[in-house]
A protein has these predicted regions:
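C-terminal substrate-binding/active-site "lid" region of AdoMet-derived donor-dependent transferases
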Residues: 1-44
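Short beta-strand to alpha-helix junction loop
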Residues: 5, 122-128, 155-161, 199-218
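Helix N-cap at the beta1-alpha1 junction of Rossmann-like dinucleotide-binding domains, i.e.
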Residues: 11, 96-98
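Rossmann-fold NAD(P)-dependent oxidoreductase module
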Residues: 16, 81, 215, 219
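Active-site substrate-recognition segment that forms the wall
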Residues: 37, 42-62, 67-85, 94, ...
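Conserved beta-strand positions in the Rossmann-like core of class I SAM-dependent methyltransferases
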Residues: 90
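Dinucleotide-binding Rossmann-like beta1-alpha1 core, especially the glycine-rich loop
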Residues: 107-189
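Helical element adjacent to the flavin cofactor pocket in flavoenzyme catalytic cores
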Residues: 199-248, 253, 261, 265-267
Length: 319
């Protein structure tokens, strides 16, 4: 039951509200007005607003069964989120355990990908960053994965980066995310002598991706089905179901909803559907090197980004 009261009892207002499904009742006046109105309606309240595109959730599938392929950061966090919403999740991974490829790096940075405008696209990345930081902090309270919210410095190491940072600093909606730091401040914050200024993302963090993935799976292990050592050789879509087959044509799993979180291997699986699913997928190269600890570098207090990035020592290694 939804009840409203208003001093407005004009006929045009009452008729419009009646057409909208409300029961309008007139009551004796308060103060000097002749009539007041009270409105009642049994309804599920739906408020239409200026929702960002990523907040408009599609209607749920008729079946709560979902398959997620790939047990890295994307697959594990998606499985965790879906299980919290009551979905029956089957997580399929070709390796013997989770986070065996890029998500198994020793260290990963959590910092915003900023644009120089205020588009919905730019806002999405800001909100994703803020959510990720808060989610990691909450998860770290019950699971250990070396979460360090030290902040991160992005050096203004060339003219292009200096221009980008100047544009960032002029945007009001990101003012709380970063601050300009001089060369001297960079040295004080980082512990090393760098030759340029930069911006300091004060809420940014770094963590162990491998343990972060493991924490997600452990947090929902009672409500998801993990299938390791399962290589998905082919996808079939038959009668509303996605069916996954291994290299021996044995059925691995089937469900009406399929989520591919297996990096570049998704292009192989979707190749046969290119005519009906014309997705623009491309492989992005990435490379991380782990170096032995060095006495001077060991003084680094927080991650510093330039054309790449460098982290403090973790497990005796510098990333």
């Amino acid at each position: 039951m939804v009840v409203f009261a208003t001093f407005t009892s004009a006929g045009v207002v009452r008729r419009a509200l009646t057409q909208a499904g409300f029961v309008v009742k007139r009551f004796p006046a308060l103060l000097e007005k002749r009539d007041d109105a009270r409105l009642e309606k049994n309804m599920t309240l739906l408020v239409e607003g200026n929702y960002a595109p990523w907040n408009r959730l599609a209607a749920s599938a008729t079946s709560p069964n979902v398959i997620v392929v790939g047990a890295g950061i994307a697959g594990a966090s998606t499985s965790w989120a879906l299980s919290k919403q009551g979905f029956n999740v089957t997580l399929v991974e070709k390796a013997a355990e989770a986070a065996q490829e890029a998500s198994g790096n020793l260290a990963g940075l959590m910092m915003p990908a900023l644009a120089t405008d205020q588009s919905s696209f730019a806002e999405y990345f800001i909100q994703a960053y803020l959510y990720s930081i808060q989610h990691a902090k909450t998860l770290a309270q019950s699971h250990q994965f070396n979460f360090s919210q030290t902040g991160i410095i992005q050096l203004a190491f060339n003219d292009r980066q200096q221009t980008r940072q100047k544009n960032w600093l002029e945007l009001e909606h990101v003012a709380d995310l970063l601050e300009w730091v001089s060369q001297e401040q960079v040295m004080a914050l980082s512990g090393l002598d760098f030759s340029c200024s930069g911006v300091y993302f004060k809420e940014a963090a770094w963590l162990s991706p491998y343990l972060y993935v493991k924490s997600h799976i452990h947090a929902c292990k009672a409500s998801i089905n993990c299938l390791f050592n399962c290589y998905v050789n082919q996808l079939h879509y038959e009668q509303g179901l996605w069916k996954l087959y291994d290299q021996h044509q044995h059925l691995i799993a089937e469900a009406p909803t399929l989520i591919l979180a297996n990096a570049s291997d998704a292009t192989r699986l979707l190749g046969q559907f290119s005519s009906v699913l014309p997705l623009s997928l491309r492989t992005v190269r990435g490379q991380v090197s782990a170096l032995e600890n060095h006495a001077r570098i060991s003084q680094l207090k927080l991650p510093v980004c330039y054309d790449g990035y460098i982290t403090p020592v973790i497990n005796g290694k510098i990333i």
